[in-house]
């Protein structure tokens, strides 16, 4: 077992976690030190990580049925975040799962790395990023700079709002 399956904390113990947590630390969404262990002292700050798919399927490719099954956990997890202003979808599956959980039409909000999608009149927005997997970074689909730019945009928007808000992963 590797990553979150081994450690019990999302994105912990694999390359995706190294990139995600270093970025969260850089932009003030985490404090402490990330050391690939759930007891490393890292603390999320005004942010939450909620997986659209709760298990790691074979070849990291969940079936539509697995995605739909996990949505019954995603929808209530989002609904209990009263201060939620921004969600960050790490990949198309997270993007589509978040939209479906919020009962939005996928065609109105196409996935695009770096895109910002206003979702509600109350100011909830969804930002898109390619997933921070080793595969995406090794193939050049996603660079560290591209990933950090998404979180720089999120931080800038939150600073304009003068609020802190959770992030969806």
Q: Where are these predicted regions, by residue range?
A:
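A polyanion-binding, active-site-adjacent surface
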Residues: 1-163
